[in-house]
Design a protein with these regions (language model features):
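Short gly/pro/ser/thr-enriched loop/turn and capping motifs at secondary-structure boundaries
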Residues: 33, 82-85, 107-112, 173-175, ...
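Peripheral docking tails and interdomain loops at the edges
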Residues: 312-378
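Conformationally flexible catalytic loops at phosphate/diphosphate-handling active centers
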Residues: 45, 162-255
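Thiamine diphosphate
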Residues: 1-128, 135, 143, 346-348, ...
Length: 378
């Protein structure tokens, strides 16, 4: 047993290695940059691991798609602004059936926002960020060891579903340091293996050869250059059913705290850690697989409680999904501006349970003796 002080971002990288990842492409952006730095150092000492610091997030996203098509387990890491730029590539990977992993370490937005302050504003971007009709499988850990484990799950889910999978994190989880035994965790993990034919054997379709993942449809594959609704539907439902089946294997959540209380608090990521001192007063539902929504599981649990309160570091994105799942209104506590504290959680829950507004009072303008703090740069 080797217990070591480990950062959340480092745990993600080590989880990727445990899952068999051999390629990383990325562009530095706070608060995900440690993953890029660690990958760079690892590649320098392990030539079998390939590393690319690309010119931007668009290139990074497309690079991991190419690496995956060539047979590697590949991933990238970014934050909200970079993930916005990657959306076209995410959709392409979904369409072509490319297993790959995107890590989004969220910060306060929109746009540059506050690069060093935590936020959870990309919850719905993951679900509907790209064009088309699909929802990537997405995980959101709340600690270092869990970040390691869900990274392995993310790679396995990507391989099994042949689709991009997202790992969500935030500034606090990414920079959280905890003493954990990741070597012991790795022993209990099982990494999905990539099964490919021998490289170089040409298939019966022009311009295609075995040994890599390729989208063998369309005019480049010798098929008519016309749209066929029936064929599209066949491919779509084949991918959808595979996706649903795989997502069901990773229906991970936590239902705990005081399960006999009459109020259920729904929260995730770092907010669930901040709110933990309230465990004696409330029940907890914490989704770990954040997408697709754990609708059936949550609905069955929520029926046992008088009130459901959703606490999250955004303006109620997940609360919208919770209401759709349980078919009744919920109380909302939005933690905005990067301020995620036990006091804010406590005050917010008390306020909404007493019938008050979701939003706290707007802070006053700073006086001339208290200048406004700079927001920083990305």
């Amino acid at each position: 047993m080797t217990r070591k002080l480990t950062q959340g971002n480092e745990a993600v990288f080590r989880g990727a290695l445990a899952a068999g990842a051999s390629y990383y492409a990325g562009y530095p952006i706070s608060p995900s940059t440690e993953i890029l730095n660690i990958a760079s150092g690892w590649a320098a000492e392990h030539p079998e691991f390939r590393f690319l610091q690309a010119e931007d997030e668009i290139a990074s996203a497309n690079a991991i798609i190419g690496a995956s098509l060539a047979g590697a387990k590949a991933f990238t890491a970014t934050s909200g602004p970079g993930f916005s730029l990657m959306q076209e590539a995410v959709g392409y990977a979904q369409k072509v059936g490319v297993p790959c992993v995107f890590v989004n370490v969220m910060r306060v937005g929109p746009a540059t926002g506050m690069p060093t302050m935590p936020g959870q504003g990309d919850i719905m971007q993951v679900k509907w960020g790209s064009t088309g009709d699909y929802t990537p499988i997405a995980f959101y850990p709340n600690g270092v060891e869990e970040a390691f484990r869900v990274t392995i799950d993310a790679f396995n889910a990507a391989e099994e579903s042949r689709s991009p999978v997202v790992i969500l994190s935030d500034t606090f989880v990414a920079h959280l340091n905890e003493v954990v035994d990741l070597d012991e965790s790795a022993l209990s993990a099982t990494a999905a293996k990539r099964e490919l034919a021998p490289l170089g054997e040409f298939t019966d379709k022009p311009r295609f050869f075995a040994g890599v993942l390729m989208y063998e449809h369309g005019p480049n594959a010798g098929e008519p250059a016309t749209a066929d609704a029936d064929e599209y539907l066949r491919q779509y439902y084949e991918a959808k059913h595979r996706h649903v089946e795989v997502a069901a294997r990773y229906a991970q959540f936590e239902h705990g705290w005081n399960v006999d209380a009459d109020v259920l608090v729904v929260c995730y990521g770092i907010v669930s850690r901040v709110a933990a001192p309230l465990r004696d007063e409330f029940a907890l539902f914490r989704p770990i697989r954040i997408h697709p929504m754990l609708s059936d599981e949550l609905a069955a649990i929520a029926d046992r409680y008088r009130e459901v309160v959703v606490v999250e570091a955004n303006d109620g994105q997940y609360a919208d999904l919770v209401e759709l799942a349980i078919h009744r209104p919920v109380k909302r506590v939005p933690l905005l501006g990067g301020r995620i504290s036990l006091e804010a959680v406590r005050e917010g829950i008390d306020r909404v349970l007493a019938g008050g507004p979701s939003e706290p009072p707007i802070p006053p303008e700073p006086s001339e003796h208290q200048p406004r703090a700079p927001l920083g740069v990305g």
